């Protein structure tokens, strides 16, 4: 499986901040020195495009850039989240930011991008995976490529327009600059990572210009037009209700499991992080690994959105779930389980019931869950939320061949459960 999960120009509408409000650092000498031995363009570089100019910024330069505060302002994962990701994730990502200016010098967007060396066959089952593993004992980089990714290293992608009315303009500006930027940085592929299908109209310029659009592993969504859990429970199939009752009875035996909800997990991070890693390591697909610093920081920098659900038995944390609450939606980002009791007590379902109950009590209308583990979500009447990958090879001669090859690497090909969802055709 291609593990990228993974993961008409509109001018004049809502022009962004003036480029003069985006000040670069006074002296790039020290910063540039650290880039001399890398494969990336130094900060301050620019790419001229037909819509305007794309400037490469560093994280340090974002603090003096007013446009950055406007990017993602109506998204659940706003600019704060991207800052946290760069500061706390330890994976081999090289983070950059493209300041997109129009011909008048107005900053219309600041789009996060990052470089990573990608395993092209991660998650592919059967003999092919075994063969590749043997070859990599001799050639470690076999079937891996340096990739320029557009989007979020720990989440779905969004267009970072300062004004949402400019999203089509931003898509055109990105399309005009990404391939050149990738080639200058010795990347073989450009990937728009995990963009929701709701962006297909704005992003149609990419397939028009040679990108392949393939389905990534989708999220799921559960509409919540109910007053409480019991009302929702009655809408499930008889077989599902019977199975859940059996699971809940086992979890509800003494000793009692108690739940707490907090926005700052920092005091408990040493307890919850091993539980997260236990689940993460069992996943057949891995991209980013969330760190203790990530959990500490996100609750303190995004207290308005971060919610940590904690379950204890006899005072010991046996499960936790990290969620983001935005408007009438709750996004279940990750879970941690103590596997010494989790399977026996069916804690996945127990925690899910508590989160949905909490969401209903707080008037939320949608529960979103991240990709994978689709079988239980199907029986809980969740629907798919399609995510797309837009992929191109930077070599124009190889790209047609690569596009043909991609259809055999698409991640959704290897999960038969997906086709059983009522809206699977939307993938």
Feature-to-residue mapping (PLM):
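Acidic/proline-rich low-complexity IDRs
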Residues: 3-6, 27-29, 56, 137, ...
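Intrinsically disordered, low-complexity segments enriched in serine/proline and basic residues
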Residues: 14-18
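Active-site/acyl-donor-binding loops of N-acyltransferases
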Residues: 2-10, 22-51, 115-119, 156, ...
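Short C-terminal domain-edge/linker segments immediately following a structured domain
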Residues: 91, 129-131, 139-147, 221-225, ...
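Hydrophobic alpha-helix feature that most strongly marks membrane-spanning transmembrane helices
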Residues: 277-284, 299-303, 316, 322-323, ...
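Acyl-donor binding region in acyl/amide transferases
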Residues: 94-95, 102, 108, 115-213, ...
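A conserved beta-strand-loop-helix scaffold within acyl/acetyltransferase catalytic domains
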Residues: 49-130, 179-180, 188-343, 425-427
């Amino acid at each position: 499986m291609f593990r990228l999960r993974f993961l008409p120009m509109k001018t004049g509408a809502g022009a962004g901040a003036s480029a003069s409000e985006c000040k670069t650092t006074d002296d790039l000498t020290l910063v540039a020195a650290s880039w001399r031995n890398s494969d990336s363009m130094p900060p301050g570089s620019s790419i001229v495009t037909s819509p305007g100019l794309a400037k490469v910024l560093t994280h340090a330069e974002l603090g003096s850039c007013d446009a950055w505060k406007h990017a993602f302002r109506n998204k659940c994962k706003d600019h704060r989240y991207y800052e946290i990701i760069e500061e706390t994730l330890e994976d081999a990502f090289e983070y950059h930011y493209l300041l997109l200016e129009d011909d008048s010098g107005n900053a219309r967007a600041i789009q996060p991008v990052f470089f990573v060396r990608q395993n092209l066959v991660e998650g592919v089952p059967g003999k092919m995976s075994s063969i590749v593993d043997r070859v990599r004992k001799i050639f470690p980089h076999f079937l891996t490529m340096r990739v320029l990714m557009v989007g979020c290293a720990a989440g779905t992608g969004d267009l970072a327009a300062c004004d949402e009315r400019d999203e089509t303009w931003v898509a055109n500006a990105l399309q005009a600059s990404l391939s050149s930027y990738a080639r200058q940085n010795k990347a073989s592929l450009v990937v728009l990572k995990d963009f929701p299908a709701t962006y297909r109209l704005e992003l149609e310029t990419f397939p028009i210009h040679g990108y392949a659009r393939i389905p990534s592993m989708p999220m799921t969504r559960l509409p919540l037009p109910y007053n409480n859990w019991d009302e929702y429970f009655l809408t499930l199939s008889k077989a599902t209700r019977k199975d859940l009752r059996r699971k809940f009875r086992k979890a509800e035996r003494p000793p009692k499991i108690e739940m707490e909800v907090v926005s700052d997990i920092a005091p408990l991070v040493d307890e919850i992080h091993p539980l997260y890693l236990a689940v993460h390591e069992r996943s057949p697909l891995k991209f980013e690994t969330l760190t203790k610093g990530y959990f500490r920081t996100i609750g303190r920098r995004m207290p308005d959105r971060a919610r940590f659900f904690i379950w204890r038995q006899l005072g010991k944390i046996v499960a936790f779930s990290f969620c983001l609450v935005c408007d009438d939606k709750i996004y279940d980002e990750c879970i941690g389980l103590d596997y010494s009791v989790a399977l026996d007590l069916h804690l996945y379902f127990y925690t899910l019931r508590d989160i949905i109950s909490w969401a209903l009590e707080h008037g939320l209308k949608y529960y979103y869950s991240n990709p994978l583990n689709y079988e239980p979500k199907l029986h809980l009447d969740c629907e798919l939320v399609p995510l797309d990958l837009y992929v191109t090879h930077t070599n124009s001669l190889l790209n047609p061949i690569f596009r043909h090859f991609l259809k055999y690497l698409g991640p959704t090909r290897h999960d038969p459960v997906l086709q059983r969802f009522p809206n699977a055709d939307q993938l």
